[in-house]
Curated annotation (Swiss-Prot):
Keywords: Apoptosis, Cytoplasm, Phosphoprotein. It comes from Rattus norvegicus (Rat). This is Apoptosis facilitator Bcl-2-like protein 14. Phosphorylated by MELK, leading to inhibit its pro-apoptotic function. PROSITE patterns: BCL2_FAMILY. A motif (BH3) lies at residues 211-225. Plays a role in apoptosis. It is found in: Cytoplasm. InterPro entries: Bcl-2-like_sf, Bcl2-like. The modification Phosphoserine is found at S44. A motif (BH2) lies at residues 307-314. GO terms for biological process: apoptotic process; positive regulation of extrinsic apoptotic signaling pathway.
Amino acid sequence: MCSTSVYDLEDIPLEDDDPNSIEFKILAFYARHHVFKSTPAVFSPKLSRTRSLSQKALGTWSTDSWTQISLPCRDSLSSEKHISLGKKKSSWRTLFRVTEKEEEPPSSPKEIHAQGPFPVERQGRNQHWSRSLSSVEQCLESEAVDSKVACIANRVAEIVYSWPPPDDSQSQGGGKFKESVPKILHFELQGPQLRPCDSKKDGEDQIINRIVELLKYSGDQLGREIKRDKALVSIFQEGLSYSVFRTITDLFLRDVDTRGESEIKAQGFKAALAIDAIAKLTAIDNHPMNRMLGFGTKYLREYFSPWVQQNGGWEKILGLSHEEVD
């Protein structure tokens, strides 16, 4: 088990920062395997992410229709795994109605190998990510990873990377972002810095909205943009308080449009997006990893865990069968 300092637990009741809780373990596993793994072929913004619905059946989505990607569930972290990836156009950027001007080298192989612990560059733009990854590894390697945790985290990744774009589901249900997203949320990644503000409060609101927008991108792209923007660098050097953390996550989820879907489908998608966003925030904050994982654990317990347990647990709301978990 990883120990935390008093500073790590600032603003977090101890019971919400329990490294043995299912929420904490899911976030830690997801952060390590689906955010910090900065292999270009896996998480490049130009990566083709698979679609969960076929061209012939772009109707309402279901937990059963989420694309099955070969990710580790039962086996040890040290064994070599194969992750099969499709070649279709990325749906994630389309879902969030954003554009990326920065070109990345195309990823040629259809099948790539992921190995754990995953190697991360120790220099340049990945240096900060390496520090965070090391912190997560210490937590995960201190005890065996629960196969249930691995399956849940991997299912979250499947949902996040397989979501159909809004033009495919616009009139037939399916999650997307509402048409009424405030214009302030739409920033060109290569555009100018945040505009001057009349007050400190306006400046804070702009920074928060900027972070919300950037959370829609891949982890590597997010890291690059944070380093480019002096205002964002400043806020993350100081560290996020839980109240700001919660505001960012709330805004990120607020405009997800799941009208026409069942409560379980809608909440399952929002829970997956929340885990993805929280994991990215842990990657870019300068405070110890346990502190941010504690924030995420607290947030999930406040807004998702009670409902999840009332509806059969994480496996059920994410569409996992007993055979996949056992």
